Amino acid sequence: MVLEIFRKPKYVTVRPEKTETTQGNERRDIPEGLWVKCSRCNEILYTKELDKNFKVCHKCNFHFRLNAQERIHMTLDEGSFQERDNELITLNPLNFPDYQEKIQSAQKATELKEAVVTGEGTIGGNPVVIGVMDSHFIMGSMGSVVGEKIARAIERAIEKKLPVVLFSTSGGARMQEGILSLMQMAKTAAALAKLDEAGLLYVAVLTDPTTGGVTASFASLGDIIIAEPGALIGFTGPRVIEQTIRQKLPEGFQRAEFLRKHGMVDMIVNRPQLKDTLANILSLHGTN
């Protein structure tokens, strides 16, 4: 009997009962998308305040990536944009596996037909032909439709005697289209050569990231080349370069600040000042 007493559990199990939560202590779910963390400094940012600041972190000046619609809204005068060549669609000329599904998925996610939006509008009252790439669409890769839309935009600028502003953000040529994708480098460069012969202005704006075939073609051919702070700009990644040359690359290699220091970029402009900077450049070149 005595031994049984000592064998009994020395604890009591308490089962919590469900009680009605008082109104004051009720849990309130925070809506998704209300806050966002800065990728550079980890600051928690209020989305509405971030949008007011052109999607630039107020603490470390990190420039978040924009989609094409956001870029157009921030750059062009309100109500002035007229889109062109939106009817062009991408095919699968090489019958690359799952390419069509990838295109459809990107179209659904971005509400775009391709990785670039082109058209006409005004910046500070200055008429301009504009092209804006979107890295959210298959990483802004350049396929046949992207190259065609940019070439047509440049040709339209020549016809109407207007300056061209192209915003670049891309992972390079689109591998699913093979040589047809690489051909767009020559096509866009040739169109810009005609623009130059016509004596018209081309301003290239390089945003994060601008790499591969886009860097090796129209992105680097501007009469004036502007970059956003911290933008990654280059042909291939630093790891590949280090493995090839067997040397350690300098700090900040392929970033906008490094390229500005070494003469590859004319100026670095913070996003909130970018529209005014473009308007001043266009006015100085007599486009108004």
UniProtKB/Swiss-Prot annotation:
Keywords for this protein: ATP-binding, Cytoplasm, Fatty acid biosynthesis, Fatty acid metabolism, Lipid biosynthesis, Lipid metabolism, Metal-binding, Nucleotide-binding, Transferase, Zinc, Zinc-finger
Gene Ontology annotations for the cellular component aspect, listed alphabetically: acetyl-CoA carboxylase complex
GO biological process, one term: fatty acid biosynthetic process
The protein's Enzyme Commission number: 2.1.3.15
Domain of life, per lineage: Bacteria
Cofactor binding: number and manner: Binds 1 zinc ion per subunit.
Record's subcellular location: Cytoplasm
Pfam families tied to this protein: Carboxyl_trans, Zn_ribbon_ACC
Zinc finger (C4-type): 38-60
Pathway stated in the Swiss-Prot or TrEMBL entry: Lipid metabolism; malonyl-CoA biosynthesis; malonyl-CoA from acetyl-CoA: step 1/1
Top-level enzyme category: transferase
Binding site for Zn(2+): C38, C41, C57, C60
UniProt keyword Metal-binding, yes or no: yes
Cross-referenced InterPro entries: AcCoA_carboxyl_beta, Acetyl_CoA_COase_Trfase_b_su, ClpP/crotonase-like_dom_sf, COA_CT_N, Znf-ACC
Transmembrane segments: none
Self-association and partners: Acetyl-CoA carboxylase is a heterohexamer composed of biotin carboxyl carrier protein (AccB), biotin carboxylase (AccC) and two subunits each of ACCase subunit alpha (AccA) and ACCase subunit beta (AccD).
Protein role: Component of the acetyl coenzyme A carboxylase (ACC) complex. Biotin carboxylase (BC) catalyzes the carboxylation of biotin on its carrier protein (BCCP) and then the CO(2) group is transferred by the transcarboxylase to acetyl-CoA to form malonyl-CoA.
Family: Belongs to the AccD/PCCB family.
Protein name (record): Acetyl-coenzyme A carboxylase carboxyl transferase subunit beta
Source organism of this protein record: Desulforamulus reducens (strain ATCC BAA-1160 / DSM 100696 / MI-1)
